[in-house]
């Protein structure tokens, strides 16, 4: 059975069950349920944070104490939470998976309009958004964005957090939409227009005959 994340509470027990049966299961604790933004243009409105971490977290099923599946293991994290350094896992809540599950099983991806992808890996440091690297031949690199650029705004909309920045890009439309970006480069304010793309077009795919 799947259980919605609105029934998940911090400090609840969580059981990571990976391949290998009980010998590879781990009793863990839910630290919090919160938003997550990843530098690779990725945002979860809700993510399940657990600790201690499971060493084989990828694709592991996370059960609660009632035996319901509440999430799927996705990441290993090393972060500072409430002033303390902490290792743990991030799991995708099952209720976020359910609407796309049939498409994923049949096609490997949701059959919804692709979000605009700009190929820019961004980190949030000291309240600033900094370009840490670029996808080779990706839209941002082709537009002239450089590693170390500071993102100031999308059009006239100031960016505040990594999640806010990505959502602002996605709110412009689907893949192919132009993304007006203002950056700070060594004290100079510069404006660029990035022609976004569908990330899937840049992925290696199986060859068919």
Spans of model-derived segments:
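Generic structural signal for buried aliphatic residues
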Residues: 8-15, 62, 151, 179
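Active-site region of chymotrypsin-like
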Residues: 1, 26-87, 116, 124, ...
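Short glycine/Trp-rich loop-beta-loop segment that forms part of the substrate-binding cleft
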Residues: 2-25, 188
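C-terminal cap/linker of serine protease catalytic domains
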Residues: 15-16, 21-23, 65, 69-125, ...
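Short, well-ordered loop/turn sites that connect or cap secondary structure elements
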Residues: 2, 8-10, 63, 145, ...
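Conserved PDZ fold ligand-binding element
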Residues: 66-70, 140-163
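Short, small/polar residue-rich loop motifs at catalytic or cofactor-binding pockets
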Residues: 54-58, 137-138, 177
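PDZ-domain C-terminal substructure recognizer with occasional recognition of PDZ-binding tails
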Residues: 103-109, 130, 143-146, 152-154, ...
């Amino acid at each position: 059975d799947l259980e919605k994340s609105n029934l998940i509470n911090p400090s609840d027990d969580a059981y990571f069950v990976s391949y290998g049966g009980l010998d590879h299961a781990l009793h863990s604790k839910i630290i919090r349920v919160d938003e997550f933004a990843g530098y690779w243009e990725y945002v979860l409105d809700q993510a399940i944070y657990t600790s201690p971490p499971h060493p084989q977290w990828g694709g592991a099923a996370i059960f609660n104490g009632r035996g319901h599946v509440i999430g799927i293991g996705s990441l290993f994290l090393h972060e500072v939470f409430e002033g303390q350094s902490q290792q743990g896992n991030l799991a995708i809540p099952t209720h976020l998976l359910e609407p796309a599950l049939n498409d994923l099983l049949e096609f490997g991806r949701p059959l919804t309009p692709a979000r605009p992808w700009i190929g820019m890996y961004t980190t949030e440091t000291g309240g600033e958004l900094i370009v840490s690297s670029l996808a080779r031949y990706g839209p941002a690199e082709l537009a002239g964005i450089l590693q170390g650029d500071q993102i100031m705004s999308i059009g006239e909309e100031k960016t505040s957090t990594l999640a806010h920045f990505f959502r602002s890009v996605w709110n412009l439309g689907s893949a192919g939409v132009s993304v007006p970006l203002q950056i700070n480069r060594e004290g100079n304010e510069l404006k660029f227009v990035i022609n976004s793309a569908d990330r899937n077009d840049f992925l290696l795919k199986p060859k068919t005959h």
